[in-house]
């Protein structure tokens, strides 16, 4: 999921460099949404593992 965020971020940067501000804005917005979704899922996963008493896998 974090990989998709990076893909949309790269698309936004390239589109911004070429002057496609609409595409750049949309791609940056999508990247931001996916990034925050990733953070929320990470926190939920950490909380569930902490409540179950499992130690994190390294």
Curated annotation (Swiss-Prot):
GO terms for cellular component: plasma membrane. Its main location: membrane. It is a multi-pass membrane protein. It is found in: Cell membrane. The chain crosses the membrane at residues 6-26, 28-48. The keyword Transmembrane helix applies. InterPro entries: DUF1328. Keywords: Cell membrane, Membrane, Transmembrane, Transmembrane helix. HAMAP family: UPF0391 (MF_01361). Belongs to the UPF0391 family. This is UPF0391 membrane protein Shew185_1413. It comes from Shewanella baltica (strain OS185). The lineage of its organism: Bacteria, Pseudomonadati, Pseudomonadota, Gammaproteobacteria, Alteromonadales.
């Amino acid at each position: 999921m974090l990989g998709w965020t990076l893909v949309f971020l790269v698309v936004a940067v390239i589109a911004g460099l070429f002057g496609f501000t609409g595409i750049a804005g949309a791609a940056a917005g999508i990247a931001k949404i996916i990034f925050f979704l990733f953070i929320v899922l990470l926190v939920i996963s950490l909380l569930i593992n902490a409540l179950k008493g499992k130690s994190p896998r390294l």
